[in-house]
Design a protein with these regions (language model features):
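Short, glycine-/polar-rich solvent-exposed loops and beta-turns at beta-strand/coil boundaries
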Residues: 1, 16-18, 69-73, 227-230, ...
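Residues embedded in well-ordered regular secondary structure
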Residues: 1-2, 9-23, 32-41, 85-225, ...
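Extracytoplasmic beta-strand/coil segments of soluble accessory domains associated
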Residues: 1-30, 55, 65-82
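Flexible glycine-/small-residue-rich
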Residues: 3-7, 27-28, 60, 81-83, ...
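A beta-strand signature from Gram-negative outer-membrane beta-barrel systems
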Residues: 50-92, 195-197, 210, 218
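A generic beta-sheet turn/junction motif
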Residues: 72, 204-208, 217, 465, ...
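Flexible glycine-rich, low-complexity coil/linker segments exposed to the extracellular/periplasmic environment
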Residues: 118-184, 276-298, 415-448, 543-558, ...
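Extracellular/periplasmic, surface-exposed regions of secreted and cell-surface proteins
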Residues: 231, 237-246, 251-256, 265, ...
Length: 719
């Protein structure tokens, strides 16, 4: 999800130490952990049941998101779940079942047709040779080939010159039914997808206690073989008034999900792509070659893969009214996620040693959040209206994972590794041929633990005069353990102004104008990187010991310590216009924004020739986004039994790569140009003969051709 353009130079998959531009998700007032698990491949957002969501609000401008400070650099999405209403108990149930399939599989020649056209391609394939004057020439006869034999000589007919005689035998044997069979690989890898979705909800209560309980079940069989997603979730919302001035809100949710990825779907997807990219490499004739020859279907159907996720979210809020309009709100929340993975591959998938393998991973993430708010609103002469908020919050995040693997299991029915591992003495198996011993480790294990903390102090003052002139100022101070020793704290201010000019006396004559307001805002928000120890440097155990203790060495993969590695900072400016017409039946919202994000993380190569610590992570890059947003809303039928609301929105964003650490272009990003451009070669037809191919002469007066293929490429900046 990208709010108002690309907010990061990077995308997921480029390492956990960068910002991917993902917004902050807040569920019922509690920030949630939003990430794609490297274990199961599932995103934590998949734990949410859409049927239990009451509303979704997107905070796009800096003023509205500033209260979240260092986590709001990519925008904020507020999700509110359904709550109970006072009155009689209400029950609702929903059930749906659907199916989907590929509209059409790519056409493929098969069997005898493929054999015939493959032969024709071989017969018409030629290879050039280099003449005495240094040019290249295609042979025109077998005699010319014979007279000009070279190390990588010419070829007049690729069929007779092929070095793969087994293919020639298969392609010539038109009477052998084995070579006339046809396999449609796409149909072997895809299926009809089925989706079952069901949920049940109950709500009700009275003025003192209100409740909502919901349960959902979702089961999807993917369109690719051996893929799918299953989820079971329970949500409970409770609101109670145990005392006259005390209100309690509690929420508890529990989710279990299981995702099947088709034996690491990414690798198999690339294999499917290769089938159509080069049909001659993966033929439909049996036996298949290329990726099919590497047992693609066996990996899909015989590999056992379990990707299970467990999540629990709990939040408790106590709101006490000390005096009239003065509220103290205390909240505590827990966000827990655990992902379990087990992958088992049978012996048949190991063509070298015929070992079965089992891999297991457990990853656990927990976030503890405490927030304390003091709010007070008052009016002076019913004209000057104030709303003051003070708060402080504390957050602690922990991440733990362990991973193990084993090989050479007793049989294909045992999918897990015991405490002693698999195999022979000391967990090792001798699979040598007698002349050279080869040992395969039967048991491996690794573990990891991360922790980070965030402390915040913030305040907000809102003022309006007769609901006509509005001013809001926010200030937040955040401190995080992940940043360098010198820059752990940062300040994030914002200011917003508004003028409801429709309330002015001179606008009353425009009876059709229900409401109109001009607004503007400026604010600073931040974003942290994902690796909690990137600024502090890492140590790794050494193989040598001193007095029985293992030594420690700097971890070269983490770079040099940077005590000034700090927040990614975004300055944003917004100007907007809101208009409502004809008793609020038609609404128009128009916005312009400009965002400048600096201090993005970059790996900087250090001067010198130090072998191990030759780079450092620094805040070195900047990008910008600007754009316009238009939203039109029309309530066609508003006060009838059948209601009809129409919405139309339009947006346009322009982004630029503004700055790199060294002042030069960064990889494919060009300073002053949009991010993530698609760049292709510009062509100008085809070469009709070798005489048209550009050439140059070396110092030895040899002719060298600038030739890659038959397509004529247009060269730029060749000087």
């Amino acid at each position: 999800v990208a709010i108002r353009g690309y907010n990061s130079l990077f995308v997921e998959g480029e390492g956990d130490d960068r910002n991917y531009g993902t917004p902050l998700y807040v569920i019922d007032g509690v920030p949630m952990q939003s990430f794609t698990s490297p274990v199961t491949g599932s995103n934590t957002l998949s734990d949410l049941d859409p049927s239990m969501i009451e509303s979704i609000e997107v905070l796009k401008d800096a003023a509205s998101a500033a209260i979240y400070g260092s986590r709001a650099g990519n925008g904020v999405i507020l999700i509110t779940t359904k709550k109970g209403q006072a009155g009689k108990a209400r029950f609702s149930a929903n059930f749906s079942y659907s199916a989907s399939w590929l509209p059409a599989a790519p056409d493929q020649w098969g069997g005898n047709y493929e054999r015939r056209y493959h032969l024709e391609a071989l017969y018409n394939t030629l290879a050039p040779y280099k003449t005495a004057d240094g040019t290249w020439k295609l042979p025109e006869s077998y005699e010319e080939v014979y007279e000009n034999r070279q190390d990588k000589g010419p070829m007049y007919n690729w069929f007779w010159g092929t070095t793969r005689p087994q293919n020639a035998i298969a392609l010539q044997d038109s009477l052998n039914s084995f070579y006339n069979n046809s396999t449609h690989w796409w149909k072997q890898n895809y299926q009809v997808a089925k989706v079952l979705n069901a949920n049940l909800q109950a709500s009700g209560g009275n003025e003192n206690v209100r409740y909502m309980i919901g349960a959902g079940y979702y089961d999807e069989e993917g369109i690719a073989v051996n893929t799918g997603f299953t989820r079971f979730n329970v949500l409970t919302n409770l609101t109670a008034m145990p005392a006259k001035k005390l209100r309690m809100d509690g929420q508890f949710s529990l989710t279990y999900s299981d995702r099947s990825r088709g034996s690491n779907a990414g690798s198999n997807a690339s294999k499917m792509e290769s089938i159509t990219s080069d049909p001659t490499d993966t033929p439909t004739l049996l036996p298949g070659g290329g990726e099919v020859g590497r047992m693609m279907l066996q990996q899909l159907n015989e590999t056992s893969e379990k990707n299970q996720s467990y999540s629990a979210r709990f939040n408790l809020v106590l709101d006490y009214e000390i005096i009239r309009n003065l509220h103290l709100k205390l909240s505590a929340g827990v966000d827990f996620n655990q992902q379990n993975q087990n992958i088992f591959k049978p012996k048949a998938l190991d063509p070298t040693y015929h070992f079965s393998t089992s891999e297991g991973t457990i990853a656990r993430d927990i976030s503890l959040i405490n927030e304390n708010l003091l709010s007070y609103n008052f009016s002076i002469k019913n004209r000057h209206n104030f709303d003051v908020l003070l708060g402080l919050s504390f957050q602690k995040d922990q991440s733990f994972n362990n991973k193990g693997s084993g090989s050479n299991g007793p049989n294909d029915h045992v999918h897990y590794v015991g405490a002693q591992g698999w195999g022979g003495d000391n967990g090792l198996n001798n699979v040598g041929d007698g002349t050279k011993d080869l040992f395969i480790s039967a048991f491996t294990y690794l573990s990891n633990f991360d922790e980070e903390r965030l402390n915040s102090y913030f305040g907000r003052v809102t003022y309006n005069f007769k609901e006509k002139y509005m001013l809001e100022a926010t200030l937040r101070r955040d401190g995080s353990s992940v940043f360098g020793e010198n820059v752990r704290w940062a300040t994030f201010p914002s200011v917003a102004l508004g003028w409801a000019f429709s309330e002015e006396p001179f606008m009353k004559r425009f009876y059709w104008l229900s409401f109109a307001k001009i607004r503007g805002s400026w604010g600073v928000s931040g974003q942290k990187f994902h690796q909690p120890y990137l600024a502090h440097g890492l140590l790794s155990p050494d193989r040598y010991t001193f007095h029985g203790n293992a030594g420690m060495l700097p971890n070269t993969s983490a770079g040099v310590i940077n005590k000034n590695l700090s927040w990614e900072e975004t300055n944003q400016y917004d100007v907007g216009l809101d208009i409502s017409l004809l008793d609020y039946r038609f609404k128009v919202n128009l916005d312009y924004y400009y965002r400048y994000t600096k201090g993005q993380l970059n790996r900087i190569t250090l001067p010198g020739n130090t072998q191990y610590l030759n780079f450092q992570w620094q805040n070195g890059m900047a990008i910008s986004n600007q754009g316009i947003e238009l939203e039109l809303i029309a309530d066609i039928f508003r006060e009838t039994a059948v209601q009809w609301r129409m919405k139309f929105n339009l947006s346009r964003n322009w982004n630029r790569f503004e700055k790199s650490a060294d002042g030069f272009d960064f990889n494919s990003q060009i300073i002053g140009r949009p991010l993530h451009q698609l760049m292709v070669f510009k062509t100008d037809g085809f070469y009709n003969s070798m005489d048209e191919v550009p050439k140059y002469y070396t110092a030895n007066k040899e002719v060298q051709l600038i030739y890659d293929n038959d397509t004529r490429m247009v060269l730029f900046n060749v000087d």
